[in-house]
């Protein structure tokens, strides 16, 4: 029987996210199980007789991959455009990239069938080396296997332990323990570990970039999973957050959450709230870079993060009963309540007001739309949405107008300069030629301009859509807090 190995000489373009597999390795047994499975797959492939059987084997393999085969935890990146242009890799079939990392140490090894046969191919290893740790770059397969077998078990969490918790799997009933650690970037151990860890923000936070680690104002919180393997404690990274310390007059610190990531295998399990609360608890009793923490803010939060933040903040406010004496009116003066929330919970004024919005929403559920108080509540929120969103578009229109005026002025100056040159020629030749520079025509003719009433109507429709989306999110938060039925 002749062995059949499917290959292609055609240069293809692959989605970098689909062909890249990130694998977290806890011990050498996982690598041995992986190797055994790969050898078995090769044997099966060698005995394939026709395309129908090949397709059958492919489907079987996909089903097996869904099951726990004793190999490393494996998952794909979400974004690769900061590593590979437009998330694309050029190469030949088959194209597969496996990035192995020690679950705790993050010692790495890149395994690829990729061979540099043509200058047209993407230099995968070269592109990864640009973004991986410079102090601890990927090592060879042989060195990686040896490291996992001999040294991975020696890894201990980075920083100072500040919290521990456990999560019980709803299906299996298995309880897993986790620990949260704090560290400052000025600690060289923290600095070096973070340099290996930060690749994950490129893979999972759109538009992210590496933080400037030469700046001493960075704090980092880590979550580690704890396992017992062969009677010994082992640790693996679960998630982390970077915090920047800003100065706040006179001798305080305003902490800002910059990056916040729970790795894909651990998402939707509740780790986000544990990490967030640990950040709050730490800064309540520990100074920041410039002194006591004034409040904790967020840098450009994504929608999902806002849901988490609203849940955590509102729950903490209600647990402390800080809304018990609040005036149930968004237009009322609740500054003293918001100030008490800031001092006790480090929640900023603006976020406290948003939590009050959600809290009041729960009070109005089931209330007729015609109710005066409920009507005032809805109008107040829509005014806020209008100011936040339409105000921005008005600013854009002003900028566009300024650019148009500047272009017109530049055109006038250019025409004057050319006319001066033409006047010299006119004097020589006895002519009277006038320079007339016309603006470049638009490639696409503009559509009919809308009048003010039509523009305002469009804006109000936009606000109504935003309000509907906001109500959905408030429902989610209140359901999570068991304040309304799901």
UniProtKB/Swiss-Prot annotation:
It catalyses: L-lysyl-[protein] + acetyl-CoA = N(6)-acetyl-L-lysyl-[protein] + CoA + H(+). The record marks 218 as: Interaction with histone H4 N-terminus. Residues 27-69, 392-481 form a coiled coil. Acetyl-CoA binds at residues 260-262, 267-273. InterPro entries: Acyl_CoA_acyltransferase (IPR016181), GNAT_dom (IPR000182), Hat1_N (IPR019467), Hat1_N_sf (IPR037113), Hist_AcTrfase_B-typ_cat-su (IPR017380). Keywords: Acyltransferase, Coiled coil, Transferase. PANTHER family: HISTONE ACETYLTRANSFERASE TYPE B CATALYTIC SUBUNIT. This is Histone acetyltransferase type B catalytic subunit DDB_G0274269.
